[in-house]
Amino acid sequence: MVPAKTRRLWTFLAAMAAVMWGVSGLFAKGLFDISPKLTPMWLTQVRLIISGAVLLIASGFLKQKPIATLKNKHNVLVIIAYGIFGLLPVQLFYFMCIQVANASIATILQFIGPFFVLGYLAITHKQVMRRLDIIAALCAFLGVFLLSTHGQFNHLAITPVALFWGILSAFGEAAYTLIPVNIVKKVSSMVVTGWGMIFAGISLLIIDPQFHAVPNKPEVWLYTAAVIVIGTIIPFQIMANALRYVIPSTVSLLDAFEPFSATVGSVLFFGLVMMPMDWVGSILVVVAAMALNLTPKQKKNKIKQKTEL
């Protein structure tokens, strides 16, 4: 039994981790505004490779045997797929959406990723969707519609390019969730994520080497460090440890702090003007995503009875 004080502490820390993810998008937006040489591609490459290296070094100190993982060919193929089809799009397309729009829009659009997971499981695994799942999905996509149009059928409030990158980022979020499901049961999530980031970063370097000179300004390196440390390394560690003390459904609900912090930050620091329909759309998406984690009380009791038998 986890002491209540410990559970409250890790619940608070998990909420702070979500805030960090949201705030990191603001640093990315600030970075892109400094110079056209600071592109989403460059930032993604730097973030993936440095963050991946740090996670692998940390996993080595924790005796999680990151090198030994590469001796299993199947594990390597899964991690490569996780990096290229999960970690790469969830970060690159997210940053591209931030560049052409803002951190708030990018974060909220990425929040519909779980609904693509739901659709995939319904089609491939014949998973029966609950009535709550269907209602939540309808609310989420209604929210995206309101956010994209301000509620006007003949008007797009955000550019089609921003919407395109945001939706691709959500698909990346779905792949990021689905691909490592089995491997993390056998291999440390830190090792899987670390190698996934390295493979994804190297693949981006092969596709588009970003070796041009970037502006040598203090704010460039400060913002880049913030994206890597505040947006990746610290929250990853917090979330990984929080799951030892807080139930996963609660941690998932705390993810709502990410779009909230990104939106508030965009309004305060980047002059984002939110129309009433924008707030309605944003709230619909976030609440709908949170609803997916709700389990009816009757179902919870059945699960508890099964575990006790």
Region annotations inferred by a language model:
Residues L62-S104, L146, I228-V246:
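Specific transmembrane alpha-helical segments of multi-pass solute transporters/efflux pumps
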Residues L48, S148-H150, V220, A256-L309:
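C-terminal-most transmembrane helix of multi-pass membrane proteins
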Residues Q110, I123-L146, L156-A162, P218-W221, ...:
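Loop-to-transmembrane alpha-helix entry segments
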Residues A18, V46, L87, Q91, ...:
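Helix-helix packing/entry segments at the starts of transmembrane helices
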Residues M1-Q45, H155-N182, I202, K304-L309:
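Glycine-/small-residue-enriched transmembrane alpha-helix faces in small-molecule transporters
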Residues L31, L43, R47, C97, ...:
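Hydrophobic/aromatic residues within transmembrane alpha-helices
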